[in-house]
């Protein structure tokens, strides 16, 4: 049985199989025990990356007839595997699915380092019937070589709460791609990049408007309040702050691009490779985005 969805499921994993065998042996010996299902928590090594999952994915929820932003919500973040100012940190992409009551449906993580650790933590919370609010309060071991003061798991909880309370709305990279430059929705949307100039020169979405976050309040008149504004930065913290500024100044349709430029580039790596010849050898990262996310 699927522990999350309470539906029949076949999940051929060694861990659940061994636990079932133990329960079977206990019952044969006269000890009454029950198996309460599996969440399908698993991990795989894919060249230099690790991919880990637990619970249901979005494809499964849709197949059950569930509707996004009604029956379930999703959050996607790009974080550092540990504090960005400590050498060796890598980008970790994480996605989580949850209900309007904060119930956790599942999560996925991909990155060179730290994916298995975070999924194990989320799986433990899910097994205890925890919610996004438990992720917010989760206290994990912290030191710069190992994590950030706000761990990526905490950031998932913070961002999920922001969604449920209406502080932020997101647009996915896939939804951006569906809007071709000639389409009516694209004409009615502004992609606002709030990173610094050197970051914008390194790589940006074609057709996007560049206004650094620090200059946004003084340049609001350059943006059309009647258009949807999709805000993007490196990982999300500056885009979230920019979105709040816009919303507080009368912009009614504001979205933050999920995962930021870091995730967008991972989905458009061929476009990024074409521009490598114009990228300086060293591009300093912005301290605002190091080891942080939306909060």
Predicted regions and their residues:
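Flexible loop/turn segments at secondary-structure boundaries
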Residues: 1, 81-83, 238-239, 264
């Amino acid at each position: 049985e699927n522990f999350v969805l309470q539906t029949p499921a076949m999940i051929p994993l060694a861990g659940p199989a061994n636990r079932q065998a133990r329960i079977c042996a206990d019952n044969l010996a006269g000890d009454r025990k029950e198996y309460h299902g599996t969440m399908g928590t698993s991990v795989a090594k894919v060249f230099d990356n690790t991919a880990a999952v637990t619970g249901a994915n979005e494809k499964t929820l849709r197949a059950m007839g569930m509707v996004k932003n009604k029956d379930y919500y999703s959050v996607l973040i790009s974080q550092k595997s540990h504090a960005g100012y400590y050498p060796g940190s890598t980008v970790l992409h994480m996605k989580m699915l949850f209900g309007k009551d904060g119930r956790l449906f599942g999560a996925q993580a991909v990155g060179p380092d730290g994916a298995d650790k975070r999924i194990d933590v989320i799986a433990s919370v899910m097994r205890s019937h925890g919610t996004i609010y438990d992720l917010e309060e989760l206290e994990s071991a912290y030191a710069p070589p190992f994590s950030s003061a706000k761990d990526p798991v905490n950031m998932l909880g913070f961002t999920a709460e922001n969604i449920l309370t209406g502080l932020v709305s997101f647009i996915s990279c896939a939804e951006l791609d569906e809007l071709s430059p000639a389409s009516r929705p694209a004409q009615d949307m502004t992609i606002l990049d709030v990173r610094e100039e050197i970051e914008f020169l390194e790589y940006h979405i074609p057709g996007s408007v560049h206004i650094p976050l620090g200059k946004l309040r003084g340049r609001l008149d350059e943006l059309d309040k009647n258009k949807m504004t999709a805000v993007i930065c490196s990982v999300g913290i500056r885009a979230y702050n920019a979105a709040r500024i816009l919303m507080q100044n009368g912009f009614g349709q504001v979205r933050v691009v999920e995962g930021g430029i870091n995730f967008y580039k991972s989905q458009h790596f061929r476009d990024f490779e074409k521009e490598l010849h114009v990228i300086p050898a060293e591009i300093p990262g912005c301290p605002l985005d190091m080891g942080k996310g939306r909060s």
